[in-house]
């Protein structure tokens, strides 16, 4: 039986003329872009204090009450004070940029000096970082207001982190729904409460869909920005590995890890991305971006961007769900109408498709074991310092771990994680990953492609209740991480564009063109508009 969420999100592009949510006669924070907000702030019809208050009212109404989306782990108690200070700056003629006074939420694996960083684990509750993550620092310098920190799949491990397990008992005991953590509990999808928000950035996805902030930050190791963006009907960008610094982000696997912006519009993603780029001495990977990053990606947002673009269709990732395929076919037809040169189909090498899951697991498990210890070594004495210590505490009955399934999953991770000196890990990192990247590049060259299109997920979003089955291994999202190339998702038809390294501007342009042509979006039915959502005017819209 198909889920309600699938019908709401995936079918909407084909039936967009049938229903349009009521809109306010004025500026509505659910639908306003950062450009809209800046115009209102500049005119004096809006203040950052009013904007922050409006978002806080939505959080108050919908996060722990009503539908109880449960996306927020920690709220910034000083958010209103910061907004007032930024309003004073604006009044005195100092505007830092387009994010001046704009609220953002952070996945709770980004370090912040003023709020704990838990990575979703109760073992890290109260853990305070000594400085902001690089990306957070850049946002704050640009005037963004960190409204709070949001839930995630614990330690950014989507699902139960038992990928690769073959023992049915381990799979069943260690299966955790995406968007659940021992620190934050279970986050719900605001479109359909029986479904999860996907992972691991499920809290960010749900919070942005529910309009708890203007934009948010997620992290992506194998699809963790794109999956939640798709499941929650928003826009997400997984940038090229090295475009954004990971300094101050709790690591999962630095060979793949990257931060990424998530928002309700392509424009907002583009604005946020440009603010956060730059070479960071604390993250050697960012050296790859020198001379390639931009400060303003909005210049690429033009209608007509898809005209003449060569877009390959990766049918290797279709055929898993008939309804999803119908939506992808409709998206392909739209691309053709917009003038794209569609290359259909393109074919990934079989060995890449067959080995990508195992390759991802070898690298991720080994690096998490080593890198979480490196991250925790400077934490206060009361916190665990190694993966083995995390496993011991999580599985100790005295701890009262609130996610016994995650305790099993962590134990499994520790049991299979290789050392970084293990020949199998070294071969995977230095040979197999290099081969994967070369194979993907060869695909772009063979078909002379500007981008590859595929369904972000081959199936609809999962129910919250785990079914005891292993996570699907046929998702294409981890290929973007294994190659290091950028991918962005969140179109109303849950598709992803996958591009060459440092082609973010081009991909955002494609997404913007598609977004403007289809205007296919839907607001979550469980978090409807509040009177305070409308700036200066009352809600007066009607369904056509």
Regions found by a protein language model. Give the residues of each.
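Bacterial N-terminal signal peptides
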Residues: 7-17
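Sec/Tat signal peptide C-region and signal peptidase I cleavage site
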Residues: 18-24
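Short, well-ordered alpha-helical
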Residues: 25-126, 152-159, 288-289, 297, ...
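Gly/Ser-rich, acidic/histidine-flanked active-site/gating loops
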Residues: 30, 110, 116, 256-258, ...
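Glycine-rich, small-residue loops and helix-cap segments
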Residues: 44, 101, 141, 213, ...
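Structural helix-boundary/capping segments
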Residues: 61, 141, 209-315, 329-336, ...
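Short glycine/serine-rich loop/turn segments
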Residues: 99-259, 284-287, 312-314, 452-469, ...
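Short helix-loop capping/hinge segments that flank enzyme active sites or metal/cofactor-binding pockets
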Residues: 100-119, 300-312, 363-436, 441, ...
